[in-house]
From Swiss-Prot:
This is Bifunctional purine biosynthesis protein PurH. Pathway: Purine metabolism; IMP biosynthesis via de novo pathway; 5-formamido-1-(5-phospho-D-ribosyl)imidazole-4-carboxamide from 5-amino-1-(5-phospho-D-ribosyl)imidazole-4-carboxamide (10-formyl THF route): step 1/1; Purine metabolism; IMP biosynthesis via de novo pathway; IMP from 5-formamido-1-(5-phospho-D-ribosyl)imidazole-4-carboxamide: step 1/1. The gene is purH. One of its GO terms (biological process) is 'de novo' IMP biosynthetic process. It comes from Paracoccus denitrificans (strain Pd 1222). GO terms for cellular component: cytosol. Gene3D superfamilies: 3.40.140.20, Methylglyoxal synthase-like domain. Its EC number is 2.1.2.3, 3.5.4.10. Residues 3-149 form the MGS-like domain.
Length: 529
């Protein structure tokens, strides 16, 4: 296989014309003949460059509104012919097929068309046919052809030519071929995913995923694991779309925890007041609403000050200077918010390692979406957990009715519990968590852990009693036995929200009545693993 191949003839046909003229001018200066089509040819000619229309080479005009223009043997023969195969070259000579050494194609903007909510027919018209066919042909024949599918690679092509006497090396062509195949695979995956949604196919026979490399990470969850961060192209506000104002590069764990924090805090409508969540290891260690952002932060912080050290903080509202100043009192890895004031940015500027992210908005917690989990030999796909419970959805199952404040706290705790690793127990008072038990194999153990954490914080804050006294509690799944409710009562809880559905519901309800608790069922579970 020949290593260095000279570039004598290029075919350029692009939708994204960023950097096109400068790139083509640099090729022309190296003596490269340029073939082109439609709008690309027009742009190049207007820039004063010499261009040969593909139609003049094929002897066949563009037709059917541009649907057919490069699907021709003269084009594909020029891309696929093996230069070291005598039969291939004889056939090319016989049919007057000239070789194409460089293919520059970026595809119709299908993904962008779908993202802006275009009509079905408009999306169909933005499915590229000729482009992917040429890209695949050129990539297959990378032994002799260089393929470019991304404007960010123009500079790399010119650098390769400069370093190799206007030739490209095999390693470079192989790299470009891999990029090309990844692009066509992602493009087809986008079309397939869109069409499945358009026809209401929830479990298509095949499902494909693709992402654009956003960041090569230093390591994964642990230093011995390699890692990278990819964006999927969606515009959902969050860590993938955020602007980083300062601080070190985000780590794998930073990204994972920041996503968990922002998705949680977005559950709380900013029109109803500020909310703050503090996260460690993808679990909340404090969540609160408040009269102001700083009030919400301080109340969330007071849930578990020890665990908050080195945590991730998310706000559902603009980060202001007062809140920023309060946050600087403890070591924090990342702060994410829809926006931040200039004063807040100035305060954080003194904390060089603190990462500040702004997103411009909040993700819609009710929006449909998919969640994935890899298992050995496959992966699981499910809808995003966007279940929401309102007061009207609750069923009171005990003799005692919850008070209005208890109902508000129950719904608040229920929302937080949705984002706590199972088994999850969340104690809340006055729209703030006061104890969280997470990730235990036994629900009663989570109940006891939440109580103990509240007692520890009460002692640290100099309080006479734990804040679980008089609290309302959420459980992400039903209580299989009465012991869980008995443990809640021992912690001083007064009201409980849970899905219900246990074969022992009657025993659990009887225990709640005996202990004077109010209990409501949601009929909805929030396991999180």
């Amino acid at each position: 296989m020949t290593d260095r191949i000279p570039l004598k003839r290029a075919l350029i046909s692009v939708s994204d014309k960023t950097g096109l003229v400068d790139f083509a001018r640099a090729l022309s200066a190296r003596g490269v003949e340029i073939l082109s089509t439609g709008g690309t040819a027009k742009t190049l000619r207007e820039a004063g460059l010499s261009v040969v229309d593909v139609a003049d080479v094929t002897g066949f005009p563009e037709m059917m509104d541009g649907r057919v223009k490069t699907l021709h043997p003269v084009v594909h023969g020029g891309l696929l012919a093996l230069r070291d195969n005598d039969e291939h070259m004889a056939a090319a000579k016989s049919h007057r097929i000239g070789m194409i050494d460089l293919l520059v194609v970026n595809l119709y903007p299908f993904e962008a068309t779908v993202a802006k909510g275009a009509a079905y027919d408009d999306c169909i018209e933005n499915i590229d046919i000729g482009g992917p066919a040429m890209i695949r042909a050129a990539a297959k024949n990378h032994a002799f052809v260089t393929v470019v599918v991304d404007v960010q690679d123009y500079a790399a092509v010119l650098a390769e030519l400069d370093a190799n006497d206007d030739r490209t090396g095999l390693a470079f062509r192989q790299r470009q071929a891999q990029i090309a195949y990844a692009r066509t695979a992602a493009y087809d995956a986008a079309v397939s995913t869109w069409m499945a949604g358009a026809i209401g196919e929830e479990t298509p026979r095949r499902r494909s995923f693709s992402g654009q490399l956003a960041q090569s990470l230093r390591y994964g969850e642990n230093p011995h694991q390699s890692a990278a961060f990819y964006r999927d192209g969606s515009d959902r506000p969050g860590v993938a779309t955020a602007r980083q104002w300062q601080g070190k590069e985000l780590s794998y764990n930073n990204i994972n925890d920041t996503d968990a924090a922002f998705e949680l805090v977005a559950e709380f409508d900013p029109a109803e007041g500020p909310a703050v969540a503090i996260i460690k290891h993808a679990n909340p260690c404090g969540v609160a609403r408040g009269d102001s952002a700083v009030d919400a932060y301080l109340r969330a912080f007071d849930c578990d000050r020890t665990s908050a050290f080195g945590g991730i903080i998310a706000l559902n509202t603009t980060l202001d200077g007062e809140t920023a100043q309060a946050i600087t009192e403890i070591f924090t890895e990342v702060v994410i918010a829809p926006d931040a004031t200039d004063e807040a940015k100035e305060i954080f500027a003194a904390k060089k390692n603190l990462r500040l992210l702004t997103t411009g908005g909040l993700p819609d917690p009710a929006a449909p979406g998919l969640a994935f989990r890899q298992v050995a030999g496959g992966f699981l796909v499910q809808g995003r957990d966007n279940g929401r419970i309102l007061r009207a959805d609750l069923k009171v199952v005990t003799k005692r009715q919850p008070t209005d404040q208890e109902l508000a706290d129950l719904l608040f705790a229920w929302t937080v519990a949705k984002h706590v690793k199972s088994n999850a127990i969340v104690y809340a008072r006055d729209l703030a968590t006061v104890g969280i038990g997470a990730g235990q194999m036994s629900r009663v153990d989570s109940t006891r852990i939440g109580k103990r954490k509240s007692e520890d914080m009460a002692e640290a804050l100099g309080l006479a009693q734990a804040l679980t006294i008089g609290s309302s509690v959420a459980s992400d799944a039903f209580f299989p036995f009465a012991d869980g409710v008995e443990a809640l009562a021992a912690a001083g809880a007064r009201a409980v929200i849970q899905p219900g559905g246990s074969m022992r519901d009657a025993e659990v309800i009887e225990a709640a009545d005996r202990l004077g608790l109010a209990m409501v069922f949601t009929g909805q579970r929030h396991f999180r693993h």
